[in-house]
Structures are given as C-alpha cells and as structure tokens.
Amino acid sequence: MTAHTNSPRIMVIGTGDTKSDELLFMADVIERAGGSPVMIDVSILGNPPYEPAYSKHDVAEAAGTTVQAIIDSGDEHSAMALMAEGATALVRGLSQRGQVDGMIALGGSLGTDLALDIAAILPLVVPKFIVSTIAYSHLLPPERIAPDLMMILWAGGLYGLNPICRSVLSQACGAVVGAAKLVEKPSAEKPLIGMTHLGSSCLKYMRFLKPELEKRGYDVAIFHATGMGGRAYEAVAAQKGFVAVFDFCIQEVTNAESGSVVTSGPDRMENAGRAGIPQIIAPGAVDMVDMPAWQNVPEQFRDRPYHAHNRLIASITVSPEQRRAVARVVAAKLERAAAPVAFILPTGGVQEWDRNGEPLHEPEALGAFLDEMRGAVSGTITFEEVDAHINAPEFASRALAVFDRWVAEGIVVKGNVA
C-alpha cells in the first residue's frame, strides 16, 4: 500500500479577486508542506493579481457559458450557481484523469455553497477540506456534505490576513497536504464486501458475518447507518467498489420517509442495484426513525415508543401504516436492481429493542411491514423468511448460506484466500 505522490496536487479554490492575499498565503503553505497547489479561480466580476492554473473563464467554459453571460444572469445567486456548475465539471474532469490528490476551498456563504458541490463529486478517500465562515452551522444541509469532508471555521477571516486567520489557514493547508501524502488508498488485494449496521447494542450480525467473510478471503467495510454512514456506503457502491453487499440496516429509508434530518439522501438503497452489485438485504431497524435527541420530538411521533440512545440521537418507532409505506418504497428500489437481490426477513424482530419485554417491541406493527413486503416484491427478488430475530445466529447463518451459494454460482467473485 502506497500513499500519493510526494508532492500531491491540491486544488485551491476561491475567488481570487476578493481573497487573493488569503489564497496566495494558502498556496505558499501548501508548497512549504510539500504539496503542489493548483489554483482555480471562481471570481466573477474582478481578476486575481496572480495567474491561476484555471481562470474564471475556464470555469465558465466548463459550465458551457461565458463569464459575461454569468454576469448578465441577473443576481449573485444565479451567478455563483453557474460558477459552481463549471468548477464542479472542471474538477470532475481533472479527477477522472487522475490529476486531483486533494482539494481545499475558501469562502463565506457563497464560496461554501460552491465548494460543497465540488467536494461531493470527488471520490471517497480523496482529501477534501473547506475553510468556511459557516463551518458546521445549521445553514449546511446534511445531504450536501460529502461523507468524508473536513471543515474548519474561518475564524477572524473574510477581509484579509491577520494572526488568527493565518493560524486557521495554515492548519487547514497542513491538514489537506498531510492527508494527501499519507492516505492509503483501498487495497485491491481482496474483494470488498459492503455491510450496513447500527451500533452493536442494536444490531449484532456483523460479529458473526465479518470473521466468516474474512475467512473466505474478503475484506469487509461496515458502515454506521446514521445518515453520513449511509452516504459513504452509497458513494462506494456508486463507484462499484463492492463485489457484494449485506445491506442489513435500512433505517435510513425510514428516516427519509419520515422527514428526519438523519438522512443519507434520496438514493439510499439504489446505487448498488444501479451498479450491478449483488445485494443481500434485511430490514434491520426499519421499524425506527432516528431523530436528534437534543430536539423536541415532532408532534406526529409524540405518542410513539421512544428510546434515547445518547444525548445526540434517539429512536422512535413508526406506526404500522408508516411501516407499510416504507416496505413499498424499499421494494420499488430493489426491483430496479441490475443484479440479483435476496431479501431475508427475520420474523422474530429487526433490532435488539424489538423483543418481547423490550420498550420498542410492537409485533403487530412488525407484522404489517412483513405482510407488505411479501406482497410488494416481485419475482425478480429472492424472498426468504427466517423464524428468528435478526440478532440470532440462525439469521446470520441463512445470510451466509445465500452468499456462499452466489459464490458457487459465480454471481459473486471468489475471495482471495492466502
């Protein structure tokens, strides 16, 4: 396993007409840290006092327009949206040609808006850093944040350099260069399996499945399905980074259908199927919606069973009608898959608190989901029921048997056993 080149190419993105002092300082820090800054100017009205690697005209051209047309668009929102489109297309092309080892962008709200788009299209594990006056604020929708994005508050910045600003910018530049130098790209030595889960207090199948899959010569990447983890899982699936997936925690679909902010976006449970990756699916935690524990419970859930996991996140069970709706959404997503799908239904419960005597146990509501799934899936999906809880050994053994059968049939590539 090797890291990037000793002089990683770092895209430095900002409006050079208004932030030239800061951007030139950042370029200098990147060079002193051993990186190669690639300046991308996203100015609109003015010009930077330096020659960028990619000018605002290059950015506009990448959006299929001109700087003058962008100026004539009528307002700063439309203008920056067009520059974001162009900068995103430009960086995407550079990345596809292997010319991007990392990115760092600087901005207030306009620059951050643009930078979020660029970070979102870069592959997972390419270091991404945004220095922003609105870092980690409520202005940033979770669905726009790349799953491996790093941010730092541009404290004391916005209008020229000062000691605080220099400290912030130098930290950020050192971080992105260090990450680009030391990052280990995923190994191709063994085929990679994707798996979703919640913490082991809720779901436990990975304790059995991970070592068994590793014995068979696979690497296993497990994603914490609390919004950002699902986004990372979907990003790798979209890149065709898995040979198969065990998508056993699909609660993020329930979250999305219930309006929770703990979302992984509208494409949850879609990218693996679209990429032709074989999927083994189970309804882990599909009975719950996650909400921030520090916010008031929404009115529609105030009479539902509630479990506070910690001070950050709480789980609330959804009604039988909501579970039926989620089942229909899940079935529709899976039916579009371009590779085999096996859906395994554990009839004894779908998370640890869904047991007799536990606070979130609602067998009638679980039955509503199971009934809807039975009727919603078509013949393109293999449908199996296990008379056991999702955390029982019988469930994990059934899932492993499906996987082994697929390997024997050539549906999944064989593992690399040393």
From Swiss-Prot:
One of the Pfam families matching this protein, by short name: UPF0261_C
UniProt superkingdom: Bacteria
CDD domains: Tm-1-like
Family membership noted in the UniProt record: Belongs to the UPF0261 family.
Protein name: UPF0261 protein BMEII0128
